[in-house]
Amino acid sequence: MAGAGPTMLLREENGCCSRRQSSSSAGDSDGEQEDSPATRARQQLEALLNKTMRIRMTDGRTLVGCFLCTDRDCNVILGSAQEFLKPSDSFSAGEPRVLGLAMVPGHHIVSIEVQRESLSGGPYL
């Protein structure tokens, strides 16, 4: 794509993702092609950044918060997170506990739902 202008690429180094600008569209220097499965997966994750998510955990708790990042172990960081205990717990009485910034271990995640942008249909995908 000649003349397409600079693009933002993500590069993973030592377990961390960093952005860099590139003026070529031939792929990055590691041989990862622009339409490779890894690139498509990364783009899908980028599209979810700052979206509200509901994460169900193995112990029955549910966390709702803003998706900030993930890592290679599938751990998820949520901002402005709230914790909802399982309904059978009489102490919780359905009220959320405000956590703020929360790290959810990947091996404890049962399901992840992303809140829809529009109000049509259900609130989560």
Swiss-Prot record:
Please classify the protein's predominant subcellular localization into one broad category.
cytoplasm
The organism's place on the tree of life at top rank: Eukaryota
Keyword Cell membrane assigned: no
Write out the GO biological process terms: negative regulation of apoptotic process
Q: Which gene encodes it?
A: Naa38
Q: How does it assemble?
A: Component of the N-terminal acetyltransferase C (NatC) complex, which is composed of NAA35, NAA38 and NAA30.
> A Gene Ontology molecular-function term?
RNA binding
**What PROSITE patterns would the database entry show?**
SM (PS52002)
Q: Does the keyword Cytoplasm apply?
A: yes
Described function: Auxillary component of the N-terminal acetyltransferase C (NatC) complex which catalyzes acetylation of N-terminal methionine residues. N-terminal acetylation protects proteins from ubiquitination and degradation by the N-end rule pathway.
- Which source organism does the UniProt entry give? Mus musculus
Its family remark reads: Belongs to the snRNP Sm proteins family.
Localization in the cell: Cytoplasm; Nucleus
N-acetylalanine, modified sites:
2
Q: What is this protein called?
A: N-alpha-acetyltransferase 38, NatC auxiliary subunit
- Residue ranges annotated as compositionally biased, kind Low complexity, are 18-28
PTM sites of type Phosphoserine: 22, 25, 29
Any one GO CC term of the record: NatC complex
Q: Which Pfam families match?
A: LSM
Q: Per the record, which residues fall in region Disordered? A: 1-42
